[in-house]
Amino acid sequence: MTEQGPLRPLNPQGFFPLLNKLSTWMWKNGDTPLEHGPCVSCADLKGWLDMLNEPLQPHHMPPRPSRQATPAQIIILGFLGIILAGALLLMLPVSSRMGVVTPFSDALLTATSATCVTGLVVHDTATYWSPFGHLVLLALIQTGGMGVVTVAVSVVMFSGRKIGLRQRWVMQESISAPQVGGIVRMTSFILKAMLLIEGTGALLLSLRFCPQFGLLQGLWYGIFHSVSAFCNAGFDLMGTSAPFSSLTGYVGDPLVWGPIALLILAGGLGFLTWQDLREHRLHFRAYRLQSKLILVSTAGLLLLSFLFFQCYEFRLPQWAELSGWERLNAAAFQAVTPRTAGFNSVDLTLLSEPGKLVTILLMLVGGSPGSTAGGFKVTTLAVLLLSARAVFFRCGSPSCFGRRFQDEALRSASAIFLMYLVFFLLGGTLICCIDGVPLLDALFESASAIGTVGLSICGTPGLSLPSHLILTFLMYVGRVGGLTMIYAVTSGSPVSSQYPQERVTVG
């Protein structure tokens, strides 16, 4: 009798091939009597049993689920990290003019407002924060306007390190690019365009501020307000004349509100639109469909809002102290600034009820995808309106400019619109219940937060801490995007199966 070696552990993965062979043999010979049919040979039996004794191979192991963060998770965590770091810096005594420690709640709201390029503040920017605090705010505004991922990729580019496929993938999601290819060139173009636009705006504003505030302070004011306007942040340093006054002292000065309005529009058009403008110039037909929708929708919103403010709002008795020239300037600027900018050239508390409502709608719409602006975006509005037109006229799929939309665009637009509407109504209702402010004013504050605008009527400093936390959450959701938040939370969820269709009547 030969001595047997130690028993090896059975390979569980060999069970399935064995089961497959046995079932095949039984299927072929199941109807044959055992005494007349073929039987299993010893060689076959030995080969089958050896399957169970085969050692485990590395390639037999099932792949482990990836634990790498998704682009959506990277984006929301990046913004959260920048906000917390900014809040800690603003809490330092060196950040305030009085050299005191700023409460964490105030620092958190201010840092969130700066990073999310909103403009809602509890302390006047010019009088409360020190020059160091202003630098911190400017860095947060620039980082939030460009996007955390864009800034990180830019640092990697300048360091000379190679940008991998995963970084390109995250960058594509961050700027809403149509494809990964050419994303590095796109990032380089964004940086150059940003520096050119902000530099030009700073120069134009300095020509007006330097004679008024002196050379150094005028240059600093030009740089700060240029970056704040291009990033659609709405932070200003004009509180030295009157706290929270914004640009009310320049209502009839186009040398100030004009460059700021142009900077707001440039930042709100989106990076892809800039690329089309650079490559195709005035050849509108050569633009991609998204750029056409952005330009046409933006022009339409600007025209309609300007006509409303000029023909109705600023003809009311409460604006009688403004001259005809100042009313024209105020109407033009008021049509632009609700596009998530946050500057104001008039006292917004004097707005009529229809004026407040129109401003709320403009703040909710916001700017364009892949831009420094917030809101549920003009492309979302365009897709919904064109889809409604297709339903009304029974045109089949919604289309424009000789192109039709994919079904995913309509589903995403509906989800984004509903999400913003729910957060806007819920936030405004909670603020109204907590602080007892009028509902329309509370909705104005809520729309300003989730649209990352920064305009205020009821006065953010006068609200309670729970309302401040609500506004902080709304600003964060409005900047990172509703779908980005959902994708980050639901990543890794199993794909649902396709169920049978059944007709449902709507409307």
Place the predicted regions along the sequence by residue.
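N-terminal acidic, proline/glycine-rich, low-complexity intrinsically disordered segments
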Residues: 2-3, 52
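Intrinsic disorder/low-complexity segments enriched in small, polar and charged residues
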Residues: 2, 29-30
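Short basic-hydrophobic amphipathic alpha-helical segments used for membrane targeting/insertion
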Residues: 3-4, 8-15, 35
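Membrane-proximal intracellular helices of multi-pass ion channels
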Residues: 13-29, 39-507
